[in-house]
Amino acid sequence: MKRYGKIEIRRWCGVCFSFLIFAFLHCTLCLAQPKREFRGAWIQCVNGQYLGKTPQQLRSMLSEQLDVLHGAGINAILFQVRAEGDALYRSDLEPWSRYLTGTQGKAPDDGWDPLAWMVEECHKRSMECHAWINPYRAKTAGTKEVAVNHIAATHPERLFQYGDLLIFNPALEINRQYTCMVIEDILKRYDVDGLHMDDYFYPYPTAGQSIPDEANFRADPRGFTSIADWRRDNVNILIQEIHDLVRRVKPWVKFGISPFGIYRNSPNGKNSKEGSATRGTQNYDDLYADIVLWQEREWVDYLIPQIYWNIGYAVADYEVLVHWWNDYCGHRPLYIGQDVERTVKEADPKNPQVHQMISKYALQRSLPNVQGSCQWYAAAVVNNPGNYRTMLEQEYHKRPALQPLMPWIDKKAPKKVGKLKIQIVSPQASVVNGIYLAWKEPKAKKELDKATRYAVYRFAPGEKPTLTPDDASHLVAIVSEPRYLLQGNQSGYTFVVTALDRMQNESKPVKVKL
């Protein structure tokens, strides 16, 4: 038997102590439940999940997805409604999407409006619904024929070819006006909570291809001598115009963007304001998207960089990039775009026995400017690879979460609820029978002051029913109707209810002891 001296014993004790401290801190970071956190998921049309299904089958599939996502703590859906100058909603401006019915311009058989339906279904579940559009892509390789009212048929001169893509020419003011017209139509007709754009601006670089806009640059350089600066300004103008439009039409709608995960590559190989320690495609230089400028100018309300790579990936390390966005792009709420399937395929460098979800969430929740995440993609969460959804349900989203505050839009809390009481409900068509907490919706004259949701807290006998801005330990539900179904024996418990407005400013509490 090997004998260990005092030095070896001390060394092993030190290692064990360090491991226990690490494990404690690691678990604390993982299990901490923020009271406010964006927990989104993208529902895309471009993966073909809608094709070959009837509207009834689609509604059933999406309803099941929403139920599962809600159970996993997701509180916002980013729903793709414009993929290539088309519409997954009833529009007089653009044709129905081929991603919905298989043929561009063909309406759903029963006249279904997916966006109107999605808004209603999200709100039933107290989830936000953000309309997700692409402002520049007009046609992809998979679209063999366009509808007679598609922009490629009516105004092909406003598009340019890049590889197998047709792109709205960002240099043309008429295209910016048209995009804003499409957005205004959505805002005026649908009760969306957000307007969302993804990572497609100028096209991703393709070998052997060049952007055919030199004639536009020579004709109207607007004082720029660099075509790269001019291209960035073309996009800047649109982003500012969309911001101004949203604030004018529906000021409570959040305007957010999910850019590619790399802003710029650092010239010295270290994270700095100039860029991250990465070696990949760049927003600034390749897509002509100056993300940092947009948040500094306050043209966007949130950012979701798509950091789909893994910890330890040499070209674009997740850990390096999350730190960079936290350090240099935190002027607006910052959420991290997570790739579910990639996360569970790669082993954690610190613990090869598990995948990377634990370390990614520990890092995300340890940084002060990161206020949530968004899952790519919703169906992947539902499918639960590597128990990803199970971990959301049991660990990271164990408690509900309010949305991060946006005081530049509105910071006035709604009035508190009235007449909080116990109510016994008999069987009805629209309400499950049972014993409810019920209350009266507070009065409001302005849209921004109206209560749209309610937070319900529960305190055990002997606990002081006090709310704090950061404590979610007693938050049991966020509901859209002025009632909450009580489960089991709640005798002796104290319930607290607050009203939430569109920006989820929280009213003063009202409590009742059972």
Descriptions of predicted regions:
Residues R36, W42-Q44, G48-S60, A131, ...:
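Active-site-adjacent "subsite" loops/lids of carbohydrate-active enzymes
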Residues S60-A87, R189-Y190, L293, W299:
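Catalytic domains of carbohydrate-active enzymes, especially glycoside hydrolases
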Residues A87-G102, R137-G163, D199-R222, N268-R279:
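Aromatic- and acidic-residue-enriched segments that line the glycan-binding/catalytic groove
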Residues I174-V182, K188-A277, T281-I307, G312-H331, ...:
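Active-site neighborhood of glycoside hydrolase catalytic domains
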Residues Y288-A314, G330-I409:
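Substrate-binding cleft of secreted/luminal carbohydrate-active enzymes
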Residues N387, M391-L448, Q504-L514:
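Pro/Thr/Ser/Gly-rich low-complexity, intrinsically disordered linker/stalk tracts
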Residues P442-D470, P509:
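Solvent-exposed loop/turn segments flanking beta-strands in beta-repeat/beta-sandwich domains
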Residues L485-S507:
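Beta-strand-rich modules
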